[in-house]
């Protein structure tokens, strides 16, 4: 079994191209992770997701603990076997979903108590329980339990949140079962305040996580403020460890973040947009529901090798989406995931060549 490691092969200014080695294989960076919230990438087979070029996907602790339960998945051989995905899996800690989906959640020093959005059952999620659930799932990369600071937040509110996240990170780290090829990432918080981002980073670096994530962005602050935070936050982190920007997935945001030193991304944008009839292309987004595509016999993109582009016209995709046919969601999702993996591949190529890539879309 391979040890967990991160090797930077090439840098261009702050942008890095490299490889993360894990127990479940290698991850080429910069990397985009499709989101498999409930143990599936919606409208896709796991092997089809692999064919798009994805090296890693994301699963969600909150949803999987509720259904079918982490204990059941463990009895069935772990999440990799359960969903027939044999590459790395990163699971989030569940905290963000608890705080955003549960109408009645209470945050204390111990953790977060909440009611299931499914049936109202009461649960308590603590740093220890979150870490245990991710262990039972067999996650390649486990995320420390954190409080995602709401936006906007005052300096004092953000400071209190950072301090709680640091204490929870310490408990998460102590609960983490170290195994060769597996990792745990700490999550930097601090809202839009440089002083707090720096303090959060310093506190978590002391805990010696295998990697670090930047949380609390893409929550309403806008691209300008997000990039401002990214201009300085990666500088506070070890350069020899992966840096993951959570929940960010617009192509322009990815490009701007990579140029500021980010290595990993996740977002529901390609899958959700695909199911809603929106395709990403090198020439801009295409709303396939638009009536102008009803007689368009051309593919979404001529040089895209996904099944939607190789085998079907925009007119056919328009028809499928308009009538609500499941195949339409599948083909549009397949195309979008392929687009995002091609985007990451192109970015890696430009970094290796020592060239700017801010014009890529």
Swiss-Prot record:
InterPro entries named among the record's database cross-references: ArchSynthase1/Queuine_TRR, TGT, TGT-like_sf, tRNA_ribo_trans-like
Name the positions where Zn(2+) binds.
304, 306, 309, 335
Enzyme class, spelled out:
transferase
**Pathway assigned in UniProt:** tRNA modification; tRNA-queuosine biosynthesis
Which EC numbers characterise this protein's activity in its record? 2.4.2.29
What cofactor does this one take? Zn(2+)
Q: Which reaction does it catalyse?
A: 7-aminomethyl-7-carbaguanine + guanosine(34) in tRNA = 7-aminomethyl-7-carbaguanosine(34) in tRNA + guanine
- Record Pfam families: TGT (PF01702)
Q: What is this protein called?
A: Queuine tRNA-ribosyltransferase
């Amino acid at each position: 079994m391979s040890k967990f490691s991160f090797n930077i092969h090439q840098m261009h200014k702050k942008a890095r191209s490299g490889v993360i080695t894990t127990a479940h294989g290698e991850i080429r960076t910069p990397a985009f992770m499709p989101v498999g919230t409930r143990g599936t990438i919606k409208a896709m087979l796991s092997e089809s997701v692999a064919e798009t070029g994805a090296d890693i996907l994301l699963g969600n602790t909150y949803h999987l603990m509720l259904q079918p339960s982490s204990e059941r998945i463990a009895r069935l051989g772990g999440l990799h076997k359960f969903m027939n995905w044999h590459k790395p899996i990163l699971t989030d800690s569940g905290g963000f979903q608890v705080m955003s989906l549960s109408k009645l959640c209470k945050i204390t020093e111990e953790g977060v108590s909440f009611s299931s959005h499914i049936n109202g059952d009461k649960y308590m999620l603590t740093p220890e329980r979150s870490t245990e659930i991710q262990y039972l799932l067999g996650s390649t990369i486990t995320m420390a339990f954190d409080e995602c600071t709401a936006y906007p937040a005052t300096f004092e509110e953000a400071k209190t949140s950072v301090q709680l996240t640091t204490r929870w990170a310490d408990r998460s780290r102590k609960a983490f079962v170290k195994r060769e090829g597996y990792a745990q990432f700490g999550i930097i918080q601090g809202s839009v305040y440089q002083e707090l981002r720096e303090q959060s980073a310093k506190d978590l670096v002391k805990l010696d996580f295998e990697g670090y994530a930047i949380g609390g962005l893409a929550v309403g602050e806008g691209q300008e403020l997000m990039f401002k935070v990214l201009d300085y936050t990666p500088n506070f982190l070890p350069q020899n460890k992966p840096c993951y920007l959570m929940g960010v997935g617009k192509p322009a945001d990815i490009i701007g973040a990579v140029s500021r030193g980010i290595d990993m991304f996740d977002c529901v944008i390609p899958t959700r947009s695909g199911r809603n009839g929106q395709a990403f292309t090198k020439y801009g987004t295409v709303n396939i529901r638009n009536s102008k595509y009803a007689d368009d016999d051309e593919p979404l993109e001529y040089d895209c090798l996904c099944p939607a582009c190789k085998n079907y016209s925009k007119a056919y995709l328009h028809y499928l989406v308009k009538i609500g046919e499941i195949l339409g969601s599948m083909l549009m999702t397949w195309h979008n995931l392929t687009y995002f993996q091609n985007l990451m591949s192109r970015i890696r190529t430009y970094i290796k060549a020592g060239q700017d890539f801010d014009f890529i879309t």
